[in-house]
Amino acid sequence: MMVQAGAPQWHVNMQEARQIAQKEHRHILLNFSGSDWCGPCIMLRKEIFDDPGFSAFADSTLVLVNADFPRMKKNQLPKDQQQLNDQLADQYNSKGQFPLTLLLTADGKVLKEWDGNPGVKAADFGAQVKAAIDAEGGH
């Protein structure tokens, strides 16, 4: 199952994302967001993730995963999706930081972490992601 948010494809199931990342030799960018209450999360999506340049970079390099934690009843996620997101939070976001963005290897090892909105232009964020992948010896 995928969620369309602007141009890039965002997965909501980490298992599926890992399978794709392993098959296509990509890294995973995992974003924890509060889409209907977290201002910095909304700005991060608008200023970086929905940027056409970042989208093109992500489409060729990354598998994007979004773990969303909306608060409004009308935006509530299905129970099974809430459980998947809770499991991801237990594993990668135990402090409950929003937004939190992690660059992972295909097998789930954390390479880089951005706590909050990175506060940079989309191209600079893409360069940070690429530098972390290159430093790890990735593609």
Enumerate the language-model features and the residues they cover:
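Loop/turn elements at helix/coil->beta-strand transitions in domains of secreted/extracellular proteins
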Residues: 24-28, 60-66, 97-99, 106-109
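The canonical Cys-X-X-Cys-His
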Residues: 38-42, 101
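Solvent-exposed loop/turn segments at secondary-structure junctions
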Residues: 35-38, 47-48, 69-73, 96, ...
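Typically the conserved alpha-helix immediately C-terminal to a functionally engaged Cys/Sec
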Residues: 41-57
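Non-catalytic, surface beta->alpha helical segment in thiol-disulfide oxidoreductase systems
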Residues: 91, 95-137
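Thiol-based oxidoreductase modules, predominantly thioredoxin-like and allied folds used
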Residues: 8-11, 54-83
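A short beta-strand-turn-helix
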Residues: 10-28, 58
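Short active-site neighborhood of thiol/selenol oxidoreductases, capturing the structured segment around
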Residues: 24-38
